[in-house]
Swiss-Prot record:
Reactions that this protein is recorded to catalyse: UDP-N-acetyl-alpha-D-muramoyl-L-alanyl-gamma-D-glutamyl-L-lysyl-D-alanyl-D-alanine + di-trans,octa-cis-undecaprenyl phosphate = Mur2Ac(oyl-L-Ala-gamma-D-Glu-L-Lys-D-Ala-D-Ala)-di-trans,octa-cis-undecaprenyl diphosphate + UMP
Gene expressing this chain: mraY
Membrane topology: Multi-pass membrane protein
Membrane-spanning ranges: 3-23, 53-73, 79-99, 119-139, 144-164, 176-196, 200-220, 227-247, 250-270, 315-335
Name by which UniProt lists this protein: Phospho-N-acetylmuramoyl-pentapeptide-transferase
UniProt KW Transferase keyword: yes
Record's subcellular location: Cell membrane
Species classification: Bacteria, Bacillati, Bacillota, Bacilli, Lactobacillales
Organism in which the protein naturally occurs: Streptococcus thermophilus (strain ATCC BAA-491 / LMD-9)
Pfam families registered for this protein in UniProt: Glycos_transf_4, MraY_sig1
BP terms from Gene Ontology: cell division; cell wall organization; peptidoglycan biosynthetic process; regulation of cell shape
Functional pathway: Cell wall biogenesis; peptidoglycan biosynthesis
Length: 340
């Protein structure tokens, strides 16, 4: 536990030291920055803000996790599969996000990777995690409380759905200063506690290291943000949460611990579906929310969508609180079951 905390502190310090150099390089090279939604006028001032900051905290977190888990890879440790699988997913999804950002910024391709290209790469990465960790572990079921749901060969489909789904869900959440970074920290704290109670210290080290790196990133990402994480950060973080929940055998908990990401994704799906339905039925598309993902709806008019505009800090605080409460309830449920 002590070494895990040292790893977290080291990740925080290195990220804080490295990020200013990244931001300065970005500005000196006059690299194109983040594009903003015109519908949210208060965001227009952020146009040109450096993005791809996730590159820094991912590199820091991966390197420090490897150093502090070196014994896992050299001594045939029982946690080898889970540790290697989690770090592999963080790296590969980070690379996918990096390619997406790179095409948008350096080649001025607005959509980055084509949707089918991004999805194909995410599925391949998810399959590799399945073969690295899940298949060797023999896992093919979901445990929810005292209920076990046998999925057999279909468990691989669940793994792919979970990883790809939450990767993109966190990506949708990363829309205002600090929202995604702190939301993921809250989620990781919950999984860190579960990992500690289960004695999964190698996974705990990865979790605490990423928490440290994200807190270091938040120093520059809180409002007014000096840098954004980009897809390189958000896609990787979402996939990381998914594989950690799988490795700890508490997959279902991500629906609650990750309730903010679920809410953001659900808002987009509902908006699109309702718009298409009303367009077919009435000849014009109608909306449930002022704008999606949900954090933009809050910005434009609060919960009802018709009130005063919310500041980014207020939106952050509201969604962070929801995430923290949901994580606390989940921990109460999980730890009560584990300690019986």
């Amino acid at each position: 536990m002590t070494m895990s905390l040292i790893a977290g502190v080291a990740a925080f310090v290195l990220t804080v030291l490295a990020m200013p150099h990244f931001i300065t390089y970005y500005k000196i090279k006059k690299i194109g920055g983040q594009q903003m939604h015109e519908d949210v006028k208060q965001h227009l001032a952020k146009a040109g803000t450096p993005t791809m900051g996730g590159t820094v905290f991912l590199v820091v977190a991966i390197l420090i996790s490897l150093i502090f888990n070196f014994h896992v890879f050299t001594e045939g440790h029982q946690a080898y599969g889970a540790t290697a699988g989690i770090l592999f997913v963080i790296l590969i999804y980070g690379i996918i996000g990096f390619l997406d950002d790179f095409l948008k910024i350096f080649h001025q391709i607005n959509e980055g990777l084509k949707p089918w290209q991004k999805m194909a790469l995410q599925i391949v990465a998810g399959l590799l995690f399945y073969f690295i960790h899940v298949l060797p572990s023999g896992t093919n079921s979901l445990a929810i409380g005292g209920l076990t749901i046998q999925l057999g060969v279909f468990y691989v489909l669940f793994v792919l759905f979970w990883i790809v789904g939450f990767s993109n869900a966190v990506n949708l959440t990363d829309g205002i200063d600090g929202l995604a970074s702190v939301s993921v920290v809250i989620s990781l704290i919950a999984y860190g506690i579960i990992a500690f109670v289960k004695g999964e210290l190698a996974i705990l080290t990865i979790i605490i290291t990423m928490i440290g790196a994200l807190l270091g990133f938040f120093v520059f990402n809180h409002k007014p943000a000096k840098v954004f994480m980009g897809d390189v950060g958000s896609l990787s973080l979402g996939a990381m949460l998914a594989v950690i929940s799988i490795a700890l055998r508490v997959e279902w908990t991500l629906l609650l611990i990750g309730v903010v990401y679920v809410l953001e994704t659900a808002s987009v799906m509902l908006q699109v579906s309702y718009f298409k339905y009303t367009k077919r039925k009435y000849g014009e598309g109608r909306r449930i929310f002022r704008m999606t993902p949900f954090h933009h709806h809050l910005e434009l008019g609060g919960i009802s969508g018709k009130g005063e505009k919310w500041s980014e800090w207020k939106v952050d605080a509201f969604l962070w609180t929801i995430g923290a409460l949901a994580s606390s309830i989940t921990l109460w449920m999980v730890l009560g079951n584990v300690m019986k």
